[in-house]
């Protein structure tokens, strides 16, 4: 059974720049005007990452555009947003992030079946330049393979 996801924003650069070792889902604390802006698809998580502050996890650099029909008390576009996770998950994440070279990256933001905004996070390790070149070669080879199969 496939799970319903209405994708709002994706971070395609994260897959290119990092080895994603583990994926997890988290809720996010939002204001009303932010939700309305997300329904219009006006969000970007290209440069966003998550970090811990004690025993909470926040999402940084996530851009949600201002909702044009909101009043003068609109939200700030790049404010840190709290992620909703279970305590065991937070402890596990903090343990993994504290290891040198690991980071917590936002991979996608979407509405789930109950119309709640969720963020897919990935515990990731940065790629070196030669790893990025290998992934480019692999992507080109897959593209060439599909062309050869179509020609036959």
From Swiss-Prot:
<dbReference type="InterPro" id="IPR000037">
    <property type="entry name" value="SsrA-bd_prot"/>
</dbReference>
<dbReference type="GO" id="GO:0005829">
    <property type="term" value="C:cytosol"/>
</dbReference>
<dbReference type="InterPro" id="IPR023620">
    <property type="entry name" value="SmpB"/>
</dbReference>
<dbReference type="InterPro" id="IPR020081">
    <property type="entry name" value="SsrA-bd_prot_CS"/>
</dbReference>
<dbReference type="GO" id="GO:0070929">
    <property type="term" value="P:trans-translation"/>
</dbReference>
<keyword id="KW-0963">Cytoplasm</keyword>
<comment type="function">
    <text>Required for rescue of stalled ribosomes mediated by trans-translation. Binds to transfer-messenger RNA (tmRNA), required for stable association of tmRNA with ribosomes. tmRNA and SmpB together mimic tRNA shape, replacing the anticodon stem-loop with SmpB. tmRNA is encoded by the ssrA gene; the 2 termini fold to resemble tRNA(Ala) and it encodes a 'tag peptide', a short internal open reading frame. During trans-translation Ala-aminoacylated tmRNA acts like a tRNA, entering the A-site of stalled ribosomes, displacing the stalled mRNA.</text>
</comment>
<dbReference type="GO" id="GO:0003723">
    <property type="term" value="F:RNA binding"/>
</dbReference>
<keyword id="KW-0694">RNA-binding</keyword>
<protein>
    <recommendedName>
        <fullName>SsrA-binding protein</fullName>
    </recommendedName>
</protein>
<comment type="similarity">
    <text>Belongs to the SmpB family.</text>
</comment>
<dbReference type="Pfam" id="PF01668">
    <property type="entry name" value="SmpB"/>
</dbReference>
